[in-house]
């Protein structure tokens, strides 16, 4: 069965319709394909349902960059510029805007001090922390329109970019009136944009198909 290697700002994934795979082996960069995660997709009555797994094999209810990659894969197959994708327990809207994929996501739920849930749990760290309970985001405000972000992802480690981490970091600083309603997020892997309209966040990034292969 074919698999598709994708990346969005260096956050890379294997997309496949194969259901029974060893996620850890597939993600291993020395003995497998190499990726931050695996996204298993299923087309059910013209609906796209996908589940995301971290590199260590653990399940995650949401992955922003992963969702953008699936959206690009799906819209190219459907020859469309708009789609709906179920990831985990929610359905998301995605569309092309010039060279970017844009996804629409409900604003995060505030759980505690700097701690949010956006499908998965993220903390905007104001100090150096070590935890395996949630994703950690280290953000620097360069100006009211620009953030620099690094994310340590639960089940993966340091990644070149994290879509949900960028969205949560933006939202955290936006509700504290430290950034404007639309920002550019700079990560080690590249640039994305996040903005807010009513109760929804919009995340825009370029997703790229790196190569296609066959999985035994």
Locations of regions flagged by a protein language model:
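Active-site donor-binding segments of glycosyltransferases and PAPS-dependent sulfotransferases
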Residues: 101
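Active-site glycine-rich loop that binds ribose-phosphate moieties when present
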Residues: 104-112, 132
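A glycine-rich beta-to-alpha transition motif near the start of alpha/beta enzyme domains, typified by
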Residues: 1-98, 116, 122-216
